[in-house]
Design a protein with these regions (language model features):
Chain A
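Internal helix-turn-beta structural module
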Residues: 9, 307-361
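A short glycine/serine-rich beta->alpha loop
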Residues: 9-14, 117-129, 222-226, 281-287, ...
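Glycine-rich, N-terminal phosphate-binding loop and its surrounding beta-alpha-beta segment
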Residues: 42-108
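Short acidic, glycine/tyrosine-flanked loop/strand segments centered on an H-E-D-like triad
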Residues: 97-123, 315-331
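Glycine-rich anion/phosphate-binding loop at the beta-strand->alpha-helix junction
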Residues: 13-19, 206-322
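Glycine-rich, mobile lid/loop segments that gate access to catalytic sites or pores
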Residues: 112-228
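N-terminal, positively charged regions that mediate nucleic acid binding
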Residues: 1-57
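Alpha-helical support elements that line or immediately flank enzyme active sites
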Residues: 19-31, 127-149, 230-238, 294-305, ...
């Protein structure tokens, strides 16, 4: 399903080369004034074509709000935003149905929908469907910001080139400010050149490259979340895995914690004035599924774009035999920079739901 | 919330030292004959006290089925299983409320529930609450087995000691048979000695150690799952993070995929007779959220048991000051071996829901 | 919330005088060819302005499908249909916020949304929002028709003028054919004149009139539904009460059953060839929440349109005092004829969900 | 499904003659002190055997709370209550599977569950399963009472004998007090004799009789509920139809509103001091799905108990032929008096969810 959420539900629709894509957001609090420019900014961070890491295919992702807003203020009714597709169905992808692209959902989508799914540009599986998520997330971010909750992500790695990580106990507001407007979001900006070189090399080789995104939520009060199946980790992961290419997620020390001893992993509590804090933050701001008041921190792993120019082996489903495939057209050699605002947005929708569950939004 | 699922819902209840714990399973197909001995076997794999990696505290986890079964056959009505607690509230944990244990949910639970939550033995946050998950999962496993779907997990690592991984394109049935009855489940059994030594050393040092569990689902037909928010990754992760101590999850190549090039990560399709398969399985049996017919493979990271004997710094919430804490009582120095059947069980509940969504169960 | 459903979810959006209204339908089976003319026909049955019972305000309810359809065949991805509003915000309703209209949601909406809801034309509370329900229901009807399930409703009464009721054990296919294309759907067409006279008299008196709609679902196989909270009555009622003006619903003999003896109300079973049927159908095709194979029959009570031309007492929320109100503009003196396809549509969405739950769709 | 609710979920389990029945309540606020005697009182109002209107079969419905309570105060964890069945499976109902009882779920349950459902005493379809609903509702009532919300119902009619109705604009607290402890709840107690005579006559004739229950919710603040599918009517009806024998529900003037003119049905607003009220209450406290601050009022129609002593025609599913059936054993000739606390309880669970949705609980 392409719907998600309880208290605040999003319902994403659209196919890459159909008439339009968009999202309905149901359950928004009324009376929140939205900064539309701020939303467009986030959408433009996700939009393709800004540099060589991204596909040069142009999208004008100007969302039209059909409902739920009056004078840019939420009415409490479902907010529907539509983005028209200007780049509609063409012959570019004509051979996909017969020869599924390795790493793509062509084959699984074909089986799941009995061959009736729209395959142009990936259809409903396309990364383009993350644009509505960014819209919804940008709305939620603005609502959360009113409660002092901020969300920022950065490119933690591309291939083997790493950015430094967030200091998990101290994420300065200025850093968040900077990351939130960046199209190549890095903590240590000196990593950019190396990362771009890595991507450029892949592009030249008709190849692509994966990476990781690290995301932090600051200002989340202690006591948000629930044990077991409505824990923060479960809620965030269930929406983040809705983003194409995400194949892993970890919170706090994550997979590193699996190598640690309890005495290393445990974060000791202390009083910082009247506030209980921890000196380290291996728990990623979450204990027993519930926020501790420390920053919530997670990292998502994104596989390399499966669309590559190199010839690949596949099958021909029509002829029932093995086949060779060359994918033409222009594709992002690395989608990690553009995934940054998408992951922030997914986190925002998740946190809005979590806040609502405990009557804090 | 402690409820999970759509087509097949589980509702877990209980507190560690309360009268009883259990689960209601709603939405089970009628007419499935359950092998109760098989269920007890899985529950005993999770039960503590079998060896030095586990707490010697004895639990008699014999579930009593109150409803939903007639002659061991599902009636279609909700199945409720209750496990009585013989080890009920005691004074052992008297200081927790004042001094939250680092790494535990004591502090966050206290804030979330305004101090009203049952803290004895961890209350509803206790690892003991995984027993009902194993019950529910064991029921689902048997139902799935009738469709040729099998689930097996093993200890992929404890600290820095690793088992070998599943061969992701070929998981022999005999291996699954063996793992499914093992209390220290390993593919390469020669790793056991080293792992036990690692755990024993931690125990001697009043410390604990984390690890990872790898889980495979075989026999899942292609075409199960959905794009976006009902993808297999999202569904499995949302229940697996309901297991205490899980801090990360990855599917297929997972975080390694983030370092790969598209030409490495893409799994090429080929015809194996009439069946479309992939030669490698970096996609972990999932493309676009939907099963490809290859084994579904994921790994979960478990942090070390936070209950350790060493003295730790914490706060005294009553006195409003920093404090020292020594945890007495007996605790697992490593919960990874016991987590194996829990993760298999969570996967089984998830897969049962996924199968139902596409009318295959 | 304006979302409904489990296996097949609808998410309705829009405000009466906003840019557009519409619906996202998520979970549709792929590969169903839709007859768009058939959908437009149902929408035109609901559209206003066809005669004196309806408001002369013109709406061009031509839905534009943005996604989920390829060559008029469902792709399995969410189907979004948008209806543009040509009649957008005007000054017609300027005094509503200060003086809530009796019988309308002006007052309650104002409290619920802190005064931020769009009040023009009733905003999200407007009867116009039933157009997307008719769209969604028309899609579902076509899918159900492929399984031999048909849905038909008629005006059971307007004020004190009654149509005859369905013969609950025998609803001829020809009657359904006729009702399904009628804009003033009656079993006994001789009632039309009297009903129209009743409505016309109300219109002349600047008043309005209520009525009831009776709806039948035929061809639903026995064994659909569930005990307790997913019973057919509960599922249908939870969506039917989403239609403005509905204040009551009854299944089978309904409120009459409350006056009956068991020996009268019980429907005896008999074999009609190989099929188990009942000789009477006081149970309305539902026993224990589950279909018996007999027609499912329910009646909904609709209150009179609250917008009337007569002067009424109300309050002035701004001046904090009692006030007089005269509603100008054109309003349906009776919405019952137009409610017929809306109720059929809500039933269709409900039945599609019920069928999916038992793997029959 | 036998689960219901969003913010506060109940999961009911059990079969009439199985080991036990009960309910898990998930999502309760922590820190609410429950008056257990008050809960038992409500359960005893529902319990059978108190007089000739009820079955003399004895049930000891003493619920055992397994979790979620500490010192009778909610911990925030799921609360599970179990009622042991002392009257377990017997031969009394041996012929049901072959010959389904008219008016019962025997036939539909048999089809739905392929003959695997437990038929003893009606299994999961039994009216006995309303005991857990009363438990859950009694918990919710106490929580609502802390917010000034009270719920009371009465026998509005048995057969053709009527009680007077609530004055919908003024429901005195003393009346609620009296109704809430009554086992034959009437506003006008002089109706009791006639009602009992009606029931006794049915009993003597080996017959049964239906009736209606009217329920009022007072103290619900204005602004609770939502337009469309989370309106108060839809939410209440979806749980009330989960009570066996309910075949109709109406809010406010309900089916009478269908005969009214707008000028009659519209409830005019006025200021009562600072409070906006309506002089009449045909809207039953609900406009646009949202509470107006006036009492919420609804009536439910209950069909007569289908178990009657008279010989009835049915079919023999085994022999595939028509058959005669005589039901022995003791059955309520009228379940309406016992349904009163059940309907109050269902309303309480519904209202608790509605209050939570708007952050008021």
């Amino acid at each position: 399903m392409s719907s998600w959420g309880d208290s605040l539900k999003i319902s994403v629709f659209g196919e890459s080369h159909g008439k339009g894509i968009g999202v309905v957001i149901d359950g928004l609090p009324a009376g929140v004034r939205l900064d539309m420019e701020g939303i467009y900014l986030q959408m433009s961070r996700r939009a393709p074509g800004k540099d060589k890491t991204a596909t040069p295919r142009l999208e004008k992702d100007i969302p039209q709000v059909l409902s739920g807003l009056l004078d840019n203020t939420t009415t409490g009714a479902p907010l529907c935003a539509v983005i028209e597709n200007t780049n509609t169905r063409s012959g570019d992808y004509g051979n996909i149905m017969s020869c599924p692209r390795p790493g793509h959902a062509d084959y699984t989508g074909n089986i799941r929908y009995g061959g009736f799914n729209d395959i142009s540009g990936g259809g409903h599986f396309s990364g383009r469907l993350t644009a509505p998520i960014v819209f919804a997330g940008s709305v939620c971010r603005q609502i959360l910001a009113e409660k002092g909750i901020r969300i920022a992500a950065h490119i933690a790695s591309i291939g083997n080139v790493n950015d430094i990580r967030f200091d998990p106990v101290d994420i300065p507001s200025e850093l968040i400010d900077r990351l939130n407007v960046s199209t190549f979001a890095l903590i240590d900006q000196s990593a950019e050149e190396k990362m771009r070189a890595e991507v450029e090399q892949c592009r030249m080789n008709l190849d692509s490259i994966g990476g990781t995104v690290e995301c932090a939520v600051t200002g989340l009060p202690a006591g948000v979340g629930s044990p077991m199946f409505y824990g923060i980790e479960g809620v965030i992961s269930s929406i983040v895995f809705g983003i194409p290419a995400v194949k892993g997620i970890e919170f706090g020390a994550g997979f590193d914690a699996a190598k640690m001893k309890g005495s290393q992993d445990n974060d000791e509590f202390y009083y910082d004035g009247d506030t209980v804090r921890t000196r380290t933050n291996n728990h990623g701001g979450i204990l027993g599924g519930i926020s501790s008041g420390m920053p919530v921190i997670f990292r998502a792993a994104l596989k390399p774009t499966p669309s590559i120019g190199k010839q690949q082996n596949t099958v021909d489903l029509v002829k029932h035999q093995d086949a060779k495939l060359e994918i033409h057209g222009r594709h992002d050699p690395c989608i990690v920079p553009r995934a940054v605002p998408v992951i922030e947005s997914a986190a925002a929708v998740a946190v809005a739901n979590l806040m609502m569950q405990v009557n804090k939004l």
